[in-house]
Amino acid sequence: MFIKISEQPSLYNDLEKKSIREILEDINAEDQKVALATQKAIPQIEKLVSQIVPRMKQGGRIFYMGAGTSGRLGVLDASEIPPTFGMPPTLVIGLIAGGDTALRNPVENAEDDTRRGWEELVEHHINDKDTVIGIAASVIRILQWPRKPMSPSK
């Protein structure tokens, strides 16, 4: 039987029946899974970073592309690069499906607009030194465009 990830059984079923302590312990247990998953992924992350760094040293940038909450977190992370690391705001760019409106309000079906996602990359003059990181499953659709000439009209 196919179960959507968002509909799988979780620690958050029946929240109304749990004590505050149980809820807090469940949240903490889920948070610990992030560190364990990251630890397992370090070899793949290392490989990715070792490929990105040389391109960035040649002027490449990172583009985070996402939808909904994932897109918002990408924009937030990109906005923290200048004050945290003293880097220019053009080094890591967060793009969210639905544009700036989607930062505060839901923009229904924005993640399905593959043309607009690619147009935003073209507007930023994306090139072969840049890296595009999709941070939501629905972003995969816009990544089909780079297989074509770098023009959203083709």
Residue spans for each PLM region:
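Short, contiguous strand/loop micro-motifs
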Residues: 10, 36-39, 104, 133-135
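Short secondary-structure boundary/capping elements
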Residues: 15-19, 44, 109-116
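N-terminal glycine-rich phosphate/adenylate-binding segment common to multiple enzyme folds
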Residues: 51, 55-64, 73
